[in-house]
Amino acid sequence: MRLSVFYIFITRLAMTKNATKNEMGSKSPNIVALVLPLLLILYTLSSQVEVVESTGRKLAFWGNPIVWTPHSNSCGGSPASVFASSKWTTGRPCRRSRPPGTNIPVSDQSP
């Protein structure tokens, strides 16, 4: 809210200076009147950007590629955590280990 009021004030001030110069006979455009509002808009937009953390998949650019991904509903699908983990054993392909804290019985899961 404060930035929008400041933007209106700067725009009005620049327009007043530009009109005053035109009355005095100067035909050159005021560069500050054009650049300053654009810089203010750019600053306002860049301040609205926030860092959002992922809650579903935990990805990393360094270290281990993928810490955990949810399992696939199909029996033949292999999540990426299987390829990143060295503890995966061949056995029943439809039952995979769950991450800690998700102790849901297999019979209650929907297909």
From Swiss-Prot:
Keywords: Apoplast, Cell membrane, Cleavage on pair of basic residues, Membrane, Secreted, Signal. One of its GO terms (molecular function) is LRR domain binding. Mostly expressed in leaves, and, to a lower extent, in roots, stems, siliques, seeds and flowers. Residues 1-46 form the signal peptide. A motif (SxS motif essential for MIK2 binding) lies at residues 72-74. It is found in: Cell membrane; Secreted, Extracellular space, Apoplast. Induction: Induced by pathogenic bacteria Pseudomonas syringae pv. tomato (Pst) DC3000, jasmonate (MeJA), ethylene (ET) and salicylic acid (SA), mainly in shoots. Its main location: membrane. Residues 89-111 are annotated as: Disordered. GO terms for biological process: response to bacterium; response to ethylene; response to jasmonic acid; response to salicylic acid. GO terms for cellular component: apoplast; plasma membrane. A motif (SCOOP motif) lies at residues 66-79. Belongs to the serine rich endogenous peptide (SCOOP) phytocytokine family. Brassicaceae-specific phytocytokine (plant endogenous peptide released into the apoplast) perceived by MIK2 in a BAK1/SERK3 and SERK4 coreceptors-dependent manner, that modulates various physiological and antimicrobial processes including growth prevention and reactive oxygen species (ROS) response regulation. Interacts with MIK2 (via extracellular leucine-rich repeat domain); this interaction triggers the formation of complex between MIK2 and the BAK1/SERK3 and SERK4 coreceptors, and subsequent BAK1 activation by phosphorylation. This is Secreted transmembrane peptide 5. The lineage of its organism: Eukaryota, Viridiplantae, Streptophyta, Embryophyta, Tracheophyta.
